[in-house]
Amino acid sequence: MGLDYLMVHVKYNIPPALLLTILYKPFFTRLEVYKIVFLCTIAVVWTTPWDSYLIRTRVWSYPADSVIGHTIFRIPLEEAFFFIIQTYNTSLIYILFNKRLILLPYLSGPIKPLTQGLFGTVALRTWRDFGILFFTGISVLGISCIRAGGEYMYLGLILSWISPILLLQWPLMYRFLLGLPPASLWVPIVLPTLYLWIVDTLALRRGTWVIESGTKVDIQLWDGLELEEALFFLVTNVMIVLGIAGMDNAIALFEYKAFVSTTAVGETPSIPRLLTLFFTRSRRYCDTNVLREMSQAVTLLKQKSQTMYLGSAMFEGQLRLDLVALYSFCRKADDLIDDAPNRATAQYWIKQCEKALELRFKLKGAALDNTAAYQQLTKSIPPQLHAAVHLLPASRLPKGPLSDLLKGFEIDMKFDSERGIFPIATEHDLEVYAYHVAGTIATLLLELVFRHHPVSISDSERLRVISAGEGMGRALQYTNIARDIVRDAEIGRVYIPSVWLAEQGLTPSMVVNQPRNPKLIPLRRRLLDKAEKCYRDTQEAISELPANVRAPVRATVTVYMDIGQVIRENEMKVWNGKLKVSRWRRFKGAWLAMS
């Protein structure tokens, strides 16, 4: 009896698990727990017979003085625990690195060709066939090594053990895997593999476990690390990552089905349902228009607001997709109107948005993948609006706040710095504007929250919470205005109320001509004070939201409001356009808000 193997866990395997758990604990979702538990179960079930055979046939062994002595099918308890702890750690690294990803667009495969050269673009089906041949070759090689026996035995057992899993997974999920960002796969494979190589080297040198001579090829990657051991840790991490990616593939299929529906809301899939989707439903059942448009919406969100993109990761499934689709419409409409070369073109786009909304809500009873409804919608509106309007979850949203949003854009159109026209004259004007361009979006967000996660509160209470949400949106808009004084002045707009400017001896025209005037600093602070008051006033309302979205809403708003604190800390950088909130600061803010 000994404690060597147990101490390997205590020193090297459990500490990373604890650290990863502490880092990720506030963000854990029920579905992620399901995924990890399921994968750990599969790891134990698949590995136990194989490992037991290796021990019984003396491919490897454990000295009596390195293990406590209790076994399961001749496998030391410490080894059985390793199946679980490795799967847990690798799965959690994968989840950490991929939390930000919106899975749905990856069902369509890679956006850009993976290989272009002398033979042209390699088709996705060619990659599928190549993968099948490759993993079949691994299986054949493994069987050949086993038949040869001797020094090739351990290598053959590893290859023949992994190949059935890879052959099963690849044809069903190759498109999804090839669509994912490469780093989302190789980082969760490489990091734990390198770490375990180091741990294994130390254990082999100490004799904690032994690969018997005559069953290995006697090639070492470095002193103390046998080729077979290095391969074992690499392929086990590959299987874990592909396993959890396979579950993400099934989740994406489930989310697609819910997203295009007009009735499904707030569901969390069970593991049996995900397995059914994985084995029976493929990307062929997904509408290419929906996948393409969601990919465009995600790209737009990442380009325009990293804070909102990362904030959206706090939400789950269909609700997150609905929020991305909502943001896509708001952002696209804003860009078309703001980037218009003249006032007439801007007015044209406002009218087109109104027309598109009217038609979209008339068709709200049709599923998103309804071809006839899609054709009816797209033939009646400009191509620039097709994706943004089509994706809108109209069956789950009221139309009123979206119409009010367009009124905010109409206020923007009233600015005319050459003629000295600035519509934000009073603090009331500022509040009205902030409601139209941001309070409406917060209202729509809460409408989606209550639709996906109904709670038993009275209509009056629900309206009170939504009204407080309008204040939450205004708080974010006041922060935006404080941040963008210089940028807004460059396009002839001043959102600081004229009466505030007059108190400092300024006019809007003076701000346009000199947006870095030091006299604006106290006014910017005043905007931030107003934002923080609105934010504080919403805290009680946030606490009344459904439990599973309360923390995500608080985290998203808190992280965005931290921009105001960064502005206060870096006032000169704001003038020079160098303001940037670090990812670590955003993560820290979200972690504290979610805890």
From Swiss-Prot:
It comes from Trichophyton verrucosum (strain HKI 0517). Its EC number is 5.5.1.19, 2.5.1.32. This is Bifunctional lycopene cyclase/phytoene synthase. Residues 256-595 are annotated as: Phytoene synthase. GO terms for cellular component: membrane. Coiled coil: none annotated. Its main location: membrane. One of its GO terms (biological process) is carotenoid biosynthetic process. It holds the Pfam family SQS_PSY. Keywords: Carotenoid biosynthesis, Isomerase, Membrane, Multifunctional enzyme, Transferase, Transmembrane, Transmembrane helix. InterPro entries: Isoprenoid_synthase_dom_sf (IPR008949), Lycopene_cyclase_dom (IPR017825), Squ/phyt_synthse (IPR002060), Squalene/phytoene_synthase_CS (IPR019845), Trans_IPPS_bact-type (IPR044843), Trans_IPPS_HH (IPR033904). Pathway: Carotenoid biosynthesis; beta-carotene biosynthesis; Carotenoid biosynthesis; phytoene biosynthesis; all-trans-phytoene from geranylgeranyl diphosphate: step 1/1. It catalyses: all-trans-lycopene = gamma-carotene; gamma-carotene = all-trans-beta-carotene; 2 (2E,6E,10E)-geranylgeranyl diphosphate = 15-cis-phytoene + 2 diphosphate. GO terms for molecular function: geranylgeranyl diphosphate synthase activity; intramolecular lyase activity; lycopene beta cyclase activity; squalene synthase [NAD(P)H] activity. It is found in: Membrane. The lineage of its organism: Eukaryota, Fungi, Dikarya, Ascomycota, Pezizomycotina. It is a multi-pass membrane protein. It comes from the Eukaryota. Bifunctional enzyme that catalyzes the reactions from geranylgeranyl diphosphate to phytoene (phytoene synthase) and lycopene to beta-carotene via the intermediate gamma-carotene (lycopene cyclase). Residues 1-249 are annotated as: Lycopene beta-cyclase. Gene3D superfamilies: Farnesyl Diphosphate Synthase. CDD domains: Trans_IPPS_HH (cd00683). In the N-terminal section; belongs to the lycopene beta-cyclase family. The chain crosses the membrane at residues 3-23, 35-55, 77-97, 130-150, 153-173, 176-196, 231-251.
